[in-house]
Amino acid sequence: MLRIADKTFNSHLFTGTGKFASSQLMVEAIRASGSQLVTLAMKRVDLRQHNDAILMPLIEAGVTLLPNTSGAKTAEEAIFAAQLAREALGTHWLKLEIHPDARWLLPDPIETLKAAEALVKQGFVVLPYCGADPVLCKRLEEVGCAAVMPLGAPIGSNQGLETKAMLEIIIQQSTVPVVVDAGIGVPSHATQALEMGADAVLVNTAIAVADDPVMMATAFRLAVEAGVLARQAVPGNRSPYASATSPLTGFLEALA
């Protein structure tokens, strides 16, 4: 079980809604993933349409919606988008995203911290997408963010946990849930993140662009479950030396 703010989730896999070939395929993949928290960009939703092709299938699927501020380049833009999302969707949950550079999509740490502090004061449950910076993640925690979402690698890059060393520090020092977001390309990346101690992962591109998104979503569900179980089982310590699993002496004498 994973608890963030006022909600509890059975699944440790969060999913996104971008890049799917159709809304039907998106919903099928989300269902196969077992995900209970789904993020969607407000810029992709037509709030004037009551039967929006992205929003309505998600509502019917019964998942918790996590609107995000993707596209915002400043704290002010993100705060405005958050207020629109709360009014339109009736949720105070928000994935805060501020990335001014369209090529790299790296989060702006200064604007993110500024917006997070303001939004928490306005009553939002803020989950900020941020760089894998232990100092920044601690500051975001201190201003009241309900979780932190450090990147594993640039958005959509499928590179995996390129920031592993920093993620380990963030996980070790955090007192709020840590959700590894961005860069996860294959199910084994997700397993590794959960084994490290991350509370959840958010996966979008790796599922959406697969030849079979539903099958890939299933693979990610199983990978996340494996990672959680492995962590709970408490793996043995790593050692630079060999450790025999069978006796090395005495067996010949026993056979004599």
Swiss-Prot record:
<comment type="function">
    <text>Catalyzes the rearrangement of 1-deoxy-D-xylulose 5-phosphate (DXP) to produce the thiazole phosphate moiety of thiamine. Sulfur is provided by the thiocarboxylate moiety of the carrier protein ThiS. In vitro, sulfur can be provided by H(2)S.</text>
</comment>
<feature type="active site" description="Schiff-base intermediate with DXP">
    <location>
        <position position="95"/>
    </location>
</feature>
<comment type="pathway">
    <text>Cofactor biosynthesis; thiamine diphosphate biosynthesis.</text>
</comment>
<keyword id="KW-0808">Transferase</keyword>
<keyword id="KW-0963">Cytoplasm</keyword>
<dbReference type="GO" id="GO:1990107">
    <property type="term" value="F:thiazole synthase activity"/>
</dbReference>
<dbReference type="Pfam" id="PF05690">
    <property type="entry name" value="ThiG"/>
</dbReference>
<protein>
    <recommendedName>
        <fullName>Thiazole synthase</fullName>
        <ecNumber>2.8.1.10</ecNumber>
    </recommendedName>
</protein>
<feature type="binding site">
    <location>
        <begin position="204"/>
        <end position="205"/>
    </location>
    <ligand>
        <name>1-deoxy-D-xylulose 5-phosphate</name>
    </ligand>
</feature>
<keyword id="KW-0704">Schiff base</keyword>
<dbReference type="InterPro" id="IPR008867">
    <property type="entry name" value="ThiG"/>
</dbReference>
<dbReference type="InterPro" id="IPR033983">
    <property type="entry name" value="Thiazole_synthase_ThiG"/>
</dbReference>
<comment type="subunit">
    <text>Homotetramer. Forms heterodimers with either ThiH or ThiS.</text>
</comment>
<feature type="binding site">
    <location>
        <position position="156"/>
    </location>
    <ligand>
        <name>1-deoxy-D-xylulose 5-phosphate</name>
    </ligand>
</feature>
<dbReference type="GO" id="GO:0005737">
    <property type="term" value="C:cytoplasm"/>
</dbReference>
<keyword id="KW-0784">Thiamine biosynthesis</keyword>
<feature type="binding site">
    <location>
        <begin position="182"/>
        <end position="183"/>
    </location>
    <ligand>
        <name>1-deoxy-D-xylulose 5-phosphate</name>
    </ligand>
</feature>
<dbReference type="GO" id="GO:0009229">
    <property type="term" value="P:thiamine diphosphate biosynthetic process"/>
</dbReference>
<dbReference type="InterPro" id="IPR013785">
    <property type="entry name" value="Aldolase_TIM"/>
</dbReference>
<comment type="similarity">
    <text>Belongs to the ThiG family.</text>
</comment>
